[in-house]
């Protein structure tokens, strides 16, 4: 290889390397978008809940924000502690993004009153966070919300703790549409498994994709 060719390769490699490093540092993902799976079939006006501060919350009240939606219950003896521990990691990594909110809904509203959820939030270490709300309300409406986004939520005497729910979260964009990555195999991922720490990277990466898309939309650059 000639000296001239080596110099040319160096001129190409250095800028590309610096660009990739800047992406890694900034957390910006530029190479893809997420599949739009559409708006769920429910009347969002009819679904009204309360958060851990006993403030009214509905899906419409988070319009304009990217939502990370999940379901749990405070007395869950199995997967919930790990789910919310891993969600906290995602929350902490994404805290700097303005138009983002985490919504965790109980499947046991009889037990999980606003006061109980507020204590749960404090114990999780996010008591002062304005980006994470813990939601309670009528069980039928909570289960309807879950099912509308293809998540499981129901009372089930055969399940540990008496309730069954998905161990995954879904991503909802600022217009209420369900969004998801396409896997390397060409399948729609749909929901983001919260049971293992290493799987949280998928969720964090895809939130960053939506954040970038949302910024472009707000700037009129669709």
Feature roles, as predicted:
Residues 44-45, 66-67, 166-167:
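Short loop/turn microsegments at loop-to-beta-strand junctions
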Residues 1-48, 213, 217-222:
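N-terminal targeting signals for export/organelle localization
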Residues 148-158:
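Surface-exposed short loop/turn segments
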Residues 50-51, 172:
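Hydrophobic alpha-helical segments, especially N-terminal targeting/anchoring helices
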Residues 57-87, 102-103:
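Short active-site neighborhood of thiol/selenol oxidoreductases, capturing the structured segment around
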Residues 157-222:
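Thiol-/selenol-based redox modules, centered on thioredoxin-like
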